[in-house]
Regions:
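FAD/FMN-dependent oxidoreductases across multiple families
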Residues: 143-250
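Flavin-dependent oxidoreductases
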Residues: 84-86, 96-126, 147, 166-175, ...
Length: 371
């Protein structure tokens, strides 16, 4: 699926997340107006109802130290220990990704990500270097998969034949090598609490399923929107101005992340529904706007929630048309209606979690009760 060729041709990059972040840190270290202190924050310092700084401990140090600031930016990731002080989180664990590395192989589309769907858990494959590919396999449930010799056998039996032929030997080698990584997949709608002197952003505030790789796009959106608000403040000791900037960020950040969130969790629901999974594949296989506009939302290039909703419903409708035309109409009418109902059931709660306007909220709540 190509990126939309508008206003110049955009391109995507596959990379190791850890290496990418380390390179960002290297760049930060070169900036003269930034002082870097490495340590572990232990507490937020509170005076009355205002956060005025942090207590932290340097590596190998015995004693804690304190830092004070007019604004503390909390970005301690998916396992945030300060989340509950700055939001009302409703965190849902969807399952786990198992990661392994394919070496020295080719995939059907060089320099592209691949989503492998079928009668097995979904797999995501994307390049991380010129000679290696990261494979992520989804495992539902509240507990991570149990690793061991039997697990290797299970992986080969369940997924080897689902891999593209050109990558099967590399997949077998990666399984036998056994260098697996597991990490949890969360869904966490943003529900911040305004606290004077602090702001929460990134995965600490809001998470979606990583199936579409939208976490970094959402984090950069948070950074950009918060920065744009803060750069207008001349004096950070003016707590009223500072509070307004943070409040505006909380009120508008969803405009940059809502399509990323809805598509990620919506597609995760689709890939586990056999009828919708087939409908999605056939829909984007039509090419043209059916593929390009969908990809533009996936890549974070298009943030039009209405466009996303239109494509989602059109995909379900197209699936029903294919099912009815392929078989006797009387046999599949019930299944077709069920497909549309399933699609509405997937998308409605996601739309409700992204600050709909009052009129749409009433309609969505009514739909949610029906499905």
């Amino acid at each position: 699926i190509p990126y939309p060729n508008k206003n110049g041709e955009p391109c995507g990059f596959g990379f190791r997340n850890g290496a990418f972040l380390q390179n960002i840190r290297k760049h930060i270290l070169t900036q003269r107006n930034i002082r870097v202190i490495e340590g572990t924050v232990t507490h937020l310092i509170e005076e009355e109802d205002t956060i005025v700084g942090v207590n932290y401990k340097r590596k190998l140090a015995a004693d804690e130290e304190s830092l004070y600031a007019h604004l503390t930016v909390v970005t301690d990731g998916p396992l945030s220990k300060f989340r509950e002080k700055l939001s009302k989180p409703v965190n849902k664990l969807n399952g786990y990704f198992l990661g392994l590395l394919l070496k020295n192989c080719e995939l059907p589309f060089a320099n592209h990500g691949h989503l492998i769907m079928g009668d097995h858990p979904p797999m995501v494959i994307y390049p991380v270097t010129s000679t290696s590919w990261r494979v992520l396999i989804d495992f539902k449930g509240e507990k991570p998969p149990r690793l061991g010799r039997d697990f290797k056998k299970f992986l080969l039996e369940e997924f080897e034949q689902a891999m593209p032929k050109s990558a099967r030997a590399a997949f077998v080698a990666a399984v036998e090598e056994g260098k697996f990584k597991t990490f949890p997949n969360h869904r966490l709608p943003a529900n911040p609490i305004k606290r004077q002197g602090a702001v929460l952003l990134g995965d600490a505030l809001n998470m979606r399923h990583p199936l579409t790789g939208g976490g970094m796009s959402a984090a950069f959106n948070d950074v950009l929107r918060l920065s744009n608000n803060l750069e207008k403040i001349i004096d950070f000791s003016n707590l009223r101005q500072l509070g307004k900037a943070v409040q505006k960020f909380y009120e508008t950040r969803h405009l940059g992340t809502q399509t990323t969130n809805i598509l990620a969790d919506g597609l995760y629901g689709v890939v586990y529904n056999p009828d919708l999974r087939k409908a999605f594949f056939e829909y984007v296989s039509r090419g043209d706007k059916y593929a390009e506009e969908t990809c533009s939302i996936l890549a974070g290039l298009n943030k039009d929630k209405k466009l996303l909703l239109n494509h989602f419903i059109a995909m379900a409708r197209y699936g029903t048309q294919l099912k009815i035309s392929a078989e006797k109409p009387g046999v599949v009418v019930t299944e077709s209606l069920s497909m549309v109902k399933d699609a509405v059931g997937i998308i409605t709660p996601l739309l409700l979690s992204e600050k709909p306007d009052p009129g749409n909220k009433l309609m969505l709540e009514a739909l949610n009760r029906i499905v």
